[in-house]
């Protein structure tokens, strides 16, 4: 049986942490920022952990 291929689009967007969790960056922070508050833009700068509900899908598309 062949190895499962990694989805390269997902590999660019998600990183696995040492403890096995998956980290991602927030959307909505590349352009059209004039009407967004400073607080909102500051929060969007930081990375976040993928929720438990999405982990099943992420593990399937990022097997290694």
Curated annotation (Swiss-Prot):
Gene Ontology biological-process entries: translation
Keyword Ribosomal protein: yes
Record keywords, A-Z: Ribonucleoprotein, Ribosomal protein
Coiled coil: none
Any single Gene Ontology cellular-component annotation: cytosolic large ribosomal subunit
Cited Gene3D superfamilies: 4.10.410.60
GO molecular function: structural constituent of ribosome
The keyword Nucleotide-binding belongs to this UniProt entry's keyword annotation: no
InterPro entries from the UniProt entry: Ribosomal_bL35 (IPR001706), Ribosomal_bL35-like (IPR021137), Ribosomal_bL35_CS (IPR018265), Ribosomal_bL35_sf (IPR037229)
Family: Belongs to the bacterial ribosomal protein bL35 family.
NCBIfam families associated with the record: rpmI_bact
Full protein name: Large ribosomal subunit protein bL35
Organism expressing this protein natively: Carboxydothermus hydrogenoformans (strain ATCC BAA-161 / DSM 6008 / Z-2901)
